[in-house]
């Protein structure tokens, strides 16, 4: 889990090496701060050599809102570069690549406006998050546009995966996210390819 510092950004692989945590540096003074949050050349060299084609943003008004776990099938499989621009969230990636040594395993990171951290979730992983503060805004760049036909999901609280979600009094989910299949019910969506 060693990290590398290059220019104004620091990144580290998490316990699933393909998932990366990126921490852009902040330069502050009496006016506030400046932070470079994305540079394509740096990203392609150090994180993933992919193009990011769309930028999305969502607001979750209530604490304990769960969105996910989501992924898309080929040819619209999405890698996601996720950041929190207001509030805070518990962000999760689950490996859904059949044959992977980390299939069904998960990693997480807390992303917040304060820490400025970003999570790279490659294609072949389901992604989801839970808000830790009210009025949390998440922004994420993706490698492929949304396709309803290729949109899939995974049960957020599947005991076979065992995500250690933060404890909340109430969880807020959409009907769609409440009825996603468990890992054992999931058809083969991605095959692991060792490189």
Curated annotation (Swiss-Prot):
Alphabetical list of Pfam families matching this protein: dTDP_sugar_isom (PF00908)
Protein's UniProt name: dTDP-4-dehydrorhamnose 3,5-epimerase
CC annotations in GO: cytosol
Active site location: 70, 140
Classification via InterPro entries: RmlC-like (IPR000888), RmlC-like_jellyroll (IPR014710), RmlC_Cupin_sf (IPR011051)
Molecular function, one GO term: dTDP-4-dehydrorhamnose 3,5-epimerase activity
EC numbers on record: 5.1.3.13
Protein species of origin: Sinorhizobium fredii (strain NBRC 101917 / NGR234)
Summary of subunit composition and partner proteins: Homodimer.
Catalysed conversion reaction: dTDP-4-dehydro-6-deoxy-alpha-D-glucose = dTDP-4-dehydro-beta-L-rhamnose
Family according to the record: Belongs to the dTDP-4-dehydrorhamnose 3,5-epimerase family.
Keywords carried by this UniProt record: Carbohydrate metabolism, Isomerase, Plasmid
SUPFAM superfamilies, A to Z: RmlC-like cupins
């Amino acid at each position: 889990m060693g990290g590398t510092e290059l220019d104004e950004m620091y990144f580290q692989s998490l316990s699933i090496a393909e998932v990366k945590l990126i921490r852009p540096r902040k330069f502050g003074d009496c006016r506030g701060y400046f932070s470079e949050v994305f540079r394509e050349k740096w990203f392609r060299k150090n994180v993933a050599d992919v193009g990011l084609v769309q930028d999305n943003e969502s607001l979750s008004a209530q604490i304990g809102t769960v969105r996910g776990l989501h992924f898309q099938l080929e040819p619209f499989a999405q890698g996601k570069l996720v950041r929190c621009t207001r509030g805070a969230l518990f962000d999760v990636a689950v490996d859904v690549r059949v044959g992977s040594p980390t299939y069904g395993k998960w990693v997480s990171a807390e992303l917040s406006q304060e820490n400025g951290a970003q999570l790279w979730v490659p294609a072949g992983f389901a992604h989801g998050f839970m808000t830790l503060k009210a009025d949390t805004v998440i922004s994420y760049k993706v490698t492929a546009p949304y396709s309803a036909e290729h949109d899939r999901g995974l049960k957020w609280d599947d005991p076979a995966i065992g995500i250690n979600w933060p404890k909340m009094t109430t969880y807020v989910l959409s009907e769609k996210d409440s009825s996603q299949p468990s890992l054992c019910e999931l058809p083969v969506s991605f095959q692991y390819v060792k490189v």
